[in-house]
Regions:
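Short glycine/proline-centered loop/turn elements that form peptide/ligand docking sites
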Residues: 23-27, 58-61, 65, 115
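Short, locally clustered residues in the helix-turn-helix/winged-helix DNA-binding domain
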Residues: 9, 35-39, 100, 127
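Short capping segments at the starts of secondary-structure elements
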Residues: 40-44
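Pre-recognition alpha-helix immediately N-terminal to the DNA-recognition helix
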Residues: 15, 32-38, 94, 121
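N-terminal leader segment of winged-helix/HTH proteins
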Residues: 1-24
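Short alpha-helical elements of helix-turn-helix
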Residues: 2-3, 26-35
């Protein structure tokens, strides 16, 4: 089953990258970061890594690229230089507001083969699996 979930995830991620890049100029990792910042404005990079499940290196590179394009601002603590607050700019929020419409439509099309009750069961099962990831990763998922 983990392989099957991975296959589905890879295909979704690859097609999302191509779609988001072509239509909005962002890759799927950038979209995940933008999306998380829309949900939790002002969070540090460590929180982004924790939520999207990526290592610090790829997240840092994507944050730098998004900052360079004017989609977010990164504030650092004056005493130690570490990042403590990342927020979307107005331009970043505008990209988010466009991409979220397309992302929700992609989700709707993907799940269209399931009845409403099946979608609810699927979401419940995926949440439970996510909460239990620590059983195989040794890490917290919160």
């Amino acid at each position: 089953m983990p392989a099957f979930i991975t296959f589905i995830g890879n295909k979704l991620s690859n097609s999302a990258t191509a779609f988001y890049q072509k239509n909005f100029g962002v890759n799927v990792t950038e979209w995940r970061i933008i999306s998380q910042l829309a949900i939790e404005p002002g969070i540090p990079a460590s929180r982004i890594c924790q939520v999207i499940g990526f290592d610090k290196g790829p997240v840092s590179r994507n944050l730098a690229a998004l900052q360079k394009r004017g989609l977010l601002t990164i504030r650092t603590a004056p005493d130690d230089g570490r990042t403590h607050s990342i927020t979307l700019t107005a331009r970043g929020r505008a990209i988010h507001d466009k991409v979220i419409v397309a992302a929700l439509e992609r989700e709707r099309r993907l799940l269209s083969c399931l009845r409403k009750d099946e979608r609810e069961v699927l979401i419940d099962l995926l949440r439970r699996l996510h909460e239990n990831l620590g059983a195989v990763t040794g890490q917290s998922t919160s």
